[in-house]
C-alpha cells in the first residue's frame, strides 16, 4: 500500500546555470516557465504565476506594476507587463552581482554566432550576448554588449512590428549608429499588402495591374531597449 509519505524515487536535474543556458540559447518557453515556478513555494505554485520572481525584483528595485508585472515565466502572457527600463535595471543588477555575473553572461548566446541570435546581423566592431524574444507584433533583444573594452547592457523592444525582418534590421541600424561610424544599413522593403478574399478580391483583380503593383502596406514600430 502506497501512502503519501512513501518516497518512490529521486530525480536530480541539471545544474541551474546549465538550465539557464539551455533556456536562453534555445529560447525555451517550457524551461523558462519551470525555472520561474521553481522559486515558488508549494502553495504559491497553485496560483500559476511567478510570484517570488515578481515580488523579488519589484521590491529590490522599486519597480511599479506598470514597469514590471510578469504573469508567467516565458513572457507570452498578453496580461504581463515589462518595460525596457525595468529590464535594463535588472540586467545592470545581475552584472554587479559577482556570484551571478559570469554564469548569467555565459548563458546568453553570442549574436551572429550561436543560439536563436546566430542569424542576427551586428556591426563587426561589437560583440553582443543577447536573448531574443518574440510574439505576434513584438520582437525584442536584451543582454550585454562589448565595444572597445567597455561593457553595456542593452534592451530593444519593437512593439507593433508587422515585419520581423524590419524589426531586426532596425536593431542592427541602432547598433551601427551608436557604436560605429559606418553608414546605416538599409531597411528591408515593406511587406506587400495581401488582397482580401471573395467578391471584393475578384473586383479588385480586374483593376489596373500597375496600381496594384505599387500598393504596399505601412509597417509601424516602436523601438526601445528591451
PLM feature segments, named:
Residues 56, 66-209, 213, 218-226:
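C-terminal soluble interaction/assembly domains
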Residues 1-98, 102-103:
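A small/polar active-site loop signature that marks catalytic segments
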Amino acid at each position: 500500500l502506497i501512502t503519501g509519505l512513501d518516497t518512490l524515487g529521486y530525480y536530480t536535474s541539471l545544474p541551474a546555470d546549465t538550465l539557464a543556458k539551455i533556456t536562453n540559447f534555445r529560447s525555451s518557453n517550457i524551461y523558462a516557465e519551470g525555472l520561474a515556478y521553481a522559486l515558488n513555494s508549494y502553495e504559491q505554485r497553485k496560483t500559476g504565476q511567478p510570484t517570488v520572481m515578481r515580488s523579488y525584483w519589484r521590491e529590490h528595485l522599486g519597480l511599479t506594476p506598470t514597469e514590471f508585472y510578469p504573469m508567467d515565466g516565458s513572457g507570452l502572457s498578453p496580461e504581463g507587463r515589462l518595460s525596457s527600463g525595468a529590464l535594463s535595471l535588472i540586467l545592470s543588477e545581475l552584472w554587479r552581482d559577482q556570484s551571478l555575473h559570469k554564469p548569467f553572461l555565459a548563458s546568453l548566446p553570442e549574436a551572429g554566432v550561436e543560439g536563436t541570435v546566430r542569424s542576427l546581423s551586428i556591426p563587426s566592431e561589437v560583440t553582443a550576448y543577447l536573448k531574443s524574444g518574440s510574439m505576434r507584433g513584438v520582437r525584442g533583444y536584451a543582454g550585454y554588449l562589448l565595444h572597445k573594452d567597455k561593457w553595456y547592457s542593452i534592451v530593444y523592444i519593437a512593439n507593433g512590428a508587422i515585419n520581423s525582418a524590419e524589426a531586426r534590421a532596425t536593431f542592427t541600424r541602432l547598433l551601427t549608429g551608436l557604436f560605429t561610424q559606418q553608414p546605416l544599413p538599409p531597411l528591408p522593403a515593406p511587406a506587400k499588402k495581401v488582397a482580401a478574399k471573395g467578391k471584393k478580391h475578384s473586383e479588385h483583380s480586374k483593376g489596373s495591374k500597375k496600381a496594384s503593383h505599387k500598393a504596399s502596406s505601412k509597417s509601424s514600430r516602436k523601438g526601445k531597449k528591451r
